[in-house]
């Protein structure tokens, strides 16, 4: 099993390039950064993680800028979005950003995506909450055309463009791995149709169904759709840095465990990284 670490990289935390060096030096496989363009000062959308939304949600750097800084000082560390809010981004520009980071990193980018939870944030981007999943699907399919075709063309409900040239193309072919976040009733449909893996948050697998059972269901659905079940990567966000917890994840069929790090300065973060590194 591979191990990664995630942090809301902010203006008051350890720099993303410094964090990347620390992780690579200690044998971590990957580094992950989340995304929020902003947080509306007034909102009714509940945060899935609890009552009070941490301020790092509105202080976080742009993920592609942070990961480019990380790429510049590392050679093997994989670099992922966890997750990118595709529904808040223009797909033509996003396709270029993904391909650019993948090329500048030498093919180390992992594209974690999701639909988000903050209705007010989405509304500021002119995205309708109820249609966000249809929008996400089209944008991903359109980006795949841009990444894989010399003259890309796409005509859908939300995304529409005639033949065009768009470079760079990603190093990884046909494109960087796409991992779907979330754990809703239709998540597996999206994973099987247009993604390369599933990336749920630890402890949110739903009542009555264990993580291991869900992984079995996902692999079965993939097989029924004609896909190789082994090609579906399982990545767990927010894994508990404890030997027993890691052993349970591995037994369940998890391919990658990602530890959460606080958005804090270097002196606070380094001891936590060192403790997590003992599990690698």
Where are these regions (language model features)?
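Active-site-adjacent structural elements that line small-molecule/cofactor binding pockets in enzymes
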Residues: 1-280
């Amino acid at each position: 099993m591979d191990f990664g670490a995630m942090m809301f990289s902010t203006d008051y935390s350890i720099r993303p390039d410094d964090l990347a060096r620390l992780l690579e030096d200690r044998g971590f496989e990957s580094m992950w950064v989340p995304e929020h363009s902003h947080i509306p000062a007034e909102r009714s959308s509940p945060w899935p993680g609890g009552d009070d939304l941490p301020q790092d949600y509105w202080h976080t750097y742009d993920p592609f800028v942070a990961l480019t800084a990380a790429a510049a000082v590392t050679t093997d560390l994989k670099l992922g979005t966890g997750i990118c809010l595709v529904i808040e981004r223009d797909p033509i520009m996003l396709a270029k950003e993904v391909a650019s980071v993948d090329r500048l990193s030498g093919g180390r980018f992992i594209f974690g995506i999701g639909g988000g939870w903050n209705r007010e944030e989405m509304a500021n981007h002119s995205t309708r909450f109820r249609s966000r999943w249809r929008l996400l699907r089209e944008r991903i399919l359109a980006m795949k055309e841009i990444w894989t075709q010399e003259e890309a063309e796409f005509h859908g409900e939300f995304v529409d463009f005639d033949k065009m040239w768009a470079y760079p193309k990603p190093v990884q072919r046909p494109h960087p791995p796409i991992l779907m976040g979330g754990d809703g009733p239709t998540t597996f449909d999206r994973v099987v149709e247009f993604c390369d893996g599933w990336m749920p948050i630890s402890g949110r697998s739903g009542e009555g169904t264990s993580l291991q059972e869900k992984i079995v269901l996902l692999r079965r659905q993939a097989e029924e759709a004609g896909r190789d079940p082994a090609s579906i990567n399982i990545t767990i966000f927010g894994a508990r840095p404890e030997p027993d917890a890691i052993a349970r994840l591995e037994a369940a069929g998890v391919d990658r465990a990602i530890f959460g790090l606080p958005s804090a300065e270097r002196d606070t973060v380094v001891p936590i990284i060192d403790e997590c590194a003992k599990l690698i």
